[in-house]
């Protein structure tokens, strides 16, 4: 009964001590150290570790399954553990009690192996991050092999990207010289190698052979057949390659040198040479010609116009036009060919595709997509073209298709988790990242990435700003987005993403607001091409230098007014 004037109190009060769970675990850890109330002993070799079943089951999935599913071990006082380092097991038992773990160069691999065995995914991820942050030309090959053994796909792809980016330094390491033939062949054949010229690849291969000349000498013909000798300078072929004693005493090697020299002496025979050996590599750090394809004019008409920009000469030149007018077109480069994919011709969304050969300045129709689409994202991964999302004339799409140049066929793969039109799409560390875009109702800041090994999509950290119709590209160990539209205004702001931190940060904005902008990497820099500033289409181009964090205006396009698709074909380094 409440007296008049007294404050009425609740009949039920909830009392809690938020720190009790963590404090309780600390007390249990102290009890364990005193050897009290322990009900299980883990034995590995000559080492024994006492613990409490309830703590192990609550903290470690492996023991949860063991102790709650009537396995034989659940009734044993002593459990024999196999295939783990004793110090790693002890550290992981301690982690079960206090949530703390010290990772260093000496224990990271044993901890990762132990965490994998005990199904502690968070620790496995932390160990992978530790290794990824410490990749170095002297250890990256070993880290890649370890990641493959432990089925750590993200670490494996990061190590692979690091190897490609730093190939010249990696080729000087003991790890490289100790590689088996099949691994060296796989490396020297990669399109993604960051080399100033094919001559560096030749020197790396020759150093590997000379490291064990007697055993590896017979491997030289196979190695040279996977190196793009025709792209070496004629003087280098004559003075260095042809004069090497290992090459001179091998008939097959001499034939490959002759083929490379013919490439320079008889240009008319180039189409008859093996395409692989005459195809430039496509690392974004080397120089490449930037092609601007299609787009819109000031009247809003779709264009078939194509022009090419030489970033070294800072000059645009007109190329042969496409067979079809295409705006909001996807562009990709594979095997030295430029593909114009889908888009909008002014009346219809397109599924058709055509390929441009810069040597002949001609366009050729190739296989059409399964779905018509414009405003989609287009990238190349492992020699395959991927198109993601877009707009089919009725709605935004989440569907994804991949194209094989070898079979001229398109295949539907796992769709994105969200419908996205006008998203930014780029390949980064062996994954396809899709950022922002819209679904017709809302504009996104969210990001997801595709693992082509498992055909699965996964979320990544969202951008700081929602945006669609923006540019996206990767360069070195970072991914970038710039410009776009956020629903209320046209953007000049740009962001940079680090996968190690899984977070975005702002970089210096562009000088100009740009929606419908294309972003592409060449010469170790980013080029923002064209766009729309809210009033008019743009022919201007800005170049971003990551070393100075500055944007600089470059020569404007000569034939376009904005909204172009772009692709970069590496320059022949001869």
From Swiss-Prot:
Gene3D superfamilies associated with the record: 1.25.40.420, Kelch-type beta propeller, Potassium Channel Kv1.1, Chain A
The BTB domain, residue ranges: 38-105
Keyword Transmembrane applies: no
Keyword vocabulary terms for this entry: Cell cycle, Cell division, Kelch repeat, Mitosis, Repeat, Ubl conjugation pathway
SUPFAM superfamilies recorded: Kelch motif (SSF117281), POZ domain (SSF54695)
Domain of life: Eukaryota
Any one of the GO BP annotations: protein ubiquitination
Traits of the deletion mutant: Retina-specific gene disruption leads to decreased light response in rod photoreceptor cells and mislocalization of alpha-transducin from the outer segment to the inner part of rod photoreceptors.
One Pfam family hit: Kelch_1
Kelch repeat residue numbers: 289-336, 337-383, 384-430, 432-477, 479-524, 525-571
Tissue specificity comment: Predominantly expressed in maturing and mature retinal photoreceptor cells.
PANTHER family, per the entry: KELCH PROTEIN (PTHR24412), KELCH-LIKE PROTEIN 18 (PTHR24412:SF497)
Function as written in the Swiss-Prot or TrEMBL entry: Substrate-specific adapter of a BCR (BTB-CUL3-RBX1) E3 ubiquitin-protein ligase complex required for mitotic progression and cytokinesis. The BCR(KLHL18) E3 ubiquitin ligase complex mediates the ubiquitination of AURKA leading to its activation at the centrosome which is required for initiating mitotic entry. Regulates light- and dark-dependent alpha-transducin localization changes in rod photoreceptors through UNC119 ubiquitination and degradation. Preferentially ubiquitinates the unphosphorylated form of UNC119 over the phosphorylated form.
Designated name of the protein: Kelch-like protein 18
Organism: Mus musculus (Mouse)
